[in-house]
Amino acid sequence: MKNTFVLFLLLAIAKGAWAVNYNTVPLPKQVQLTNDNGFLLDASCVIVYNGQDAQMKRNAHFLSAYIDKQTGMQLAVTDKAPKGTKCIRLAVNTKLTNDEGYKLTVGKRQGIVIEGGSARGVFYGVQTLRKALADEAKGQSAVLMPSVVITDEPRFPYRAMHLDVCRHFFSVEQVKEYIDILALHNMNTFHWHLTDDQGWRIESKKFPRLHEIGSKRRHTVIGRNTGLFDDTPYGGYYTQEQLREVVRYAEERCINVIPEVELPGHALAILAAYPELGCTGGPYETEPTWGVFDDILCAGNEKSFELLCGVMDEIADIFPSKYINIGGDEAPKKRWEQCAKCQKRIQEQGIHGDSTLTAEAKLQGYFTNRMEQYIKKLGRSIIGWDEIMEGDISQSATILCWRGIEHGMKAALAGHDVIMAPTAYCYFDYYQLDEEKVWSKPLLIGGYVPLQKVYSYEPAPAELNEETRQHIIGVQANIWTEYIAWRSLLLYQMLPRAAALSELQWVKPEQKDYDAFVERLPRLLTVYDQEGYTYCPSY
């Protein structure tokens, strides 16, 4: 057997074939090389998908395109394999209990088989095969595939990255590229931050002033709130059809898009369009600087809820996601303390402050619960930043923890599902190299989150018991764009830290090894190069 394989290998090399490496990023759960003679992938192979499932067909065409880009070989796609043809078979295997799990088998007899617990699982098997192909295989007539059985599944069901398009706007094509990168890293969720003080990015047919006025600011601050401005109007929004287009694009890549509409704070773009919804009546403008601002939506004004509920109707019609993110962070209560309508609401609701929270802080709990009740009628659930815990909120609310690990632990102990995204490990708008931080080049918001620190993070702390740990449903990294205005810097901040993040999301703690990860990383960097992605070359 050994001599036969050696002969096979020599013949493969003579034909210009190159071997692959299955130690990809994220690392598969189990990679077992077998004694079969392996498989020679060449242009005569056909990709066969099983059944009439549209996602399976897309998976097959994705794989064909990936192999073409990686090797130059153009493989046909079919739902029926001709007899005697070498095949890559894609199929659903109901014996795999995790919908996102897969089994990848390579051997001389069976060829290449990717089985998934669902079409989504097959998609992740396709990504592993894509990343396993050697960069050196480009232009070669064949690729040697060592025989192997890979069994794999993700650790967490929620694996996400976030993008702020309010401080700076990114086009539909740039957002699609961002989604492509998430798919490459086995992520399944895109958190789209669509509204903030600095811009409203959603076309609203019910409340058109939101995008007509709220999407534009008259100028933008230069540097870190220097008081100097560029005197250039700035704006942009997505039409409802463009939003649907992005949702479809993401769904094809097994990614769920969660829209975020900030409330009650970070709402100056709303107030610029509808000043009667503020506590003072204005005047307001779409904010040209960065920070946290006192003017928020009036909790005592019924028209605030009329607008928000109307917007949620539109959001639910565009986005099929189970979740709608309602923000809830950084909402100062100064205006509510001075607002007659808000004080009347506090009295009507019988809200009283205590030693830990003021009545105005608890009023936000009323605001959150009221919006959650409406969103539930739409068949959806809410996610909110961890500040929404500062009030009597429903246990059904999912908490997105950003201020520190302790907030996530508190939420999990209270029975909430929790997504971990702490600034110290998961803010990719922070510097990643020490020299960047020292010299402030590029100009960023600050902070320091190098690659190794991202990799070191453990989202489900050992202090939690097993039952509570089950409430940690995933991990997310955030990119805020106060100082990130163009594609190349966005991708530079994202990569390769997204690779480290993907291992937090996918790989169990006992498998993690930073040195081994760094050894595997260069192979993924070749994919970045092929795709034209900018990335930080030092780590």
Where are the model-predicted features located?
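Flexible, acidic glycine-rich loops studded with aromatic residues
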Residues: 381-397, 402-539
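Feature activates predominantly on carbohydrate-active enzymes
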Residues: 96-305, 309-323, 370, 374, ...
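Flexible loop/turn segments at secondary-structure boundaries
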Residues: 55-56, 169-171, 197-203, 264-270, ...
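Residue-level detector of anion-binding/catalytic polar loops
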Residues: 74, 188-189, 256, 381, ...
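A generic structural signal for well-ordered alpha-helical segments
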Residues: 67-68, 182, 250, 375, ...
